[in-house]
Amino acid sequence: MVELLRKDQKVENTWDLESIFKTNEDFWKQFKEVEKLIPEIQSYKGKVKEGAKALLEVFKAEEDMMLKVEQLTIYAYLRKDQDSTDAEYGEIYAKTMNLSSKFYSEWSFLKPELLSIEEDVLLGYADELDELKIYKFELEKLNKKRQHTLGSEQEKIIAMAGEALKASDETFAALNNADVEFEKVEDKEGNKHTLTHGTYGTYMESTDRVLRKNTFHSLYNYFKKHNNTLASTLGGNLKRKKYYADVYKYSSTRNNALSNNLIPEEVYDNLVAVVNKKIPALQRYYELHKRAKGLEDFRLYDRAVSMVKGDPIKFTFEEARDIVLEAVKPMGEEYVNDMRKAFTERWIDIYPNKGKRSGAYSWGGYTTKPFILLNFDGTLNDVYTLIHELGHSMHSYYTRKNQPYVYGSYSIFVAEVASTCNEALLTEYLYNKFEKEGNKNGMLRVLNQALSGFVGTVYRQTQFAEFEHTINQHLQNGGALTADYLNTEYFNLIKKYYGDVFTYDEDIKYEWSRVPHFYYNYYVYQYATGYSAAQALSKLILGDSKNAKVYIDEFLSKGNSNYPIEVLKNAGVDMSKPDSIELALQDFEEKIEKFEKL
């Protein structure tokens, strides 16, 4: 297939980046304005101590500049992603990243200065002026960090050590990306294929079992070869995070990670405990896989192949658009009409072209459209991707429509809720549609999509979360993070989750060493909690149309104006209790039963 060039894309199929800057000349004009503003930032140093009016002046100046930088950044990033072969946009991106880095570095004095003001005085400022009242919650959040903030000289020393402390992460990135080279893999015909991180998923979904087996072993042979080095890099990363937790007076690495958004630690523990109770449901799902594929010797490299035989369903983009607009009708007329803007106002860059970034995402700023990058190819998965990214964009749209800039985004803890809630609505709509049509293949494919999505997001991410917490606790208790320890812990966890459904290849014990999320800080659990919250919210919306209005007003529109756990609670889901996770797992079991009956 000949790859389309960017210049050959029809305008109506591309995103409207001209709504940010009509021309590159307009971009460079604003770029130069910001360059001139950066030296002025130092004039605001020390000002916040002068009183409420001065504080408001500093906040307004910072916001005005940030909006300009945000516009530049989004334009540069999206232009680069639409065609990485365009040298002009490569230059725009590189220069913008440099400018953005300088800008944020220059404003780094602000938070320490705010925390140098006594708590009652600082919060008193917010009551003095009406225009400052909107910042009160932000100042209250900042105040909670006082006991975890050091003096300016200590902070400076820690900041200076930051780059050196990241050496383990950089070594992992080099081994996992820049220096990675896998052995070529043979298919059943003896043809050799180049294996990369990008092609791994495609080969593992192949119906050619020889190719899958060789792909699996080629990948893990590489990580086996670097086992001790990767144990050292992960160990170094965990030690760095423990160091920061100790220095900033947190009780543990997890306590540090979750405290930023006041997420109770029992949210994490509830997730692991409830999912552990329902491990038999995961094993039942894989037994279903095993039977559907007719394999006695069922291996981990057989997991990704679809359980549904026959030709896949294909969709045009216009059909996908109509389907998603129908699927979200339970959300009410306002939501449907607002989502329609994504198609009429060119939020979406639809089709692949040479040099375009792979995958999909939603991104935009406070003053821009909530843009969506797709690489639409007409599969059922592409329809799910469309409604997923629209969920993110609608969350951003309502947040920015209803919140001031200071609260105009939302935390990672809730980031996947709106997108996954939309997916649940799509599953409900498509299943019912295919059932009415008597389309058994369609019903099976929708259930297969929902089940595999659940396993990948709830079970797999909880398994990762359990491993992450186990090894952090081991380090906290003075244990050594050796390759043998990490391999054994991970392999035991794999066997616990998958039971005796599979015949195990020991290579899987090296899987921990290729997961970049373990280098983040207690991040993966949020995929599973977000998915569970979304399932619970979709049930509320489908059960009573009044709940859709509550969801829009109390969740989608709230941004960062409250703690994420409270935002979800006000929308009808209390993540401090295990109920929503239990409900999601119950729904998973019901879908397995439906699949078995079909």
Stretches found by the model and what they are:
Residues 410-440, 450-452, 456, 530:
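Post-HExxH zinc-binding segment in Zn-dependent metallohydrolases
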Residues 292-330, 336, 344, 395, ...:
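Long, K/E/R/D-enriched contiguous segments that form extended
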Residues 326, 330-337, 363, 392, ...:
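Conserved helix-loop functional segments at active or binding sites
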Residues 8-9, 22, 110, 114-117, ...:
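C-terminal, non-catalytic "cap/extension" segments appended to globular domains
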Residues 312-317, 367-387:
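Short pre-active-site segment immediately N-terminal to the catalytic Zn-binding motif
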Residues 313-315, 348-368:
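Catalytic zinc-binding patch centered on the HExxH motif and its immediate surroundings
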Residues 1-310, 597:
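A well-structured
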Residues 384, 396-420:
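Post-HEXXH active-site segment of zinc metalloproteases
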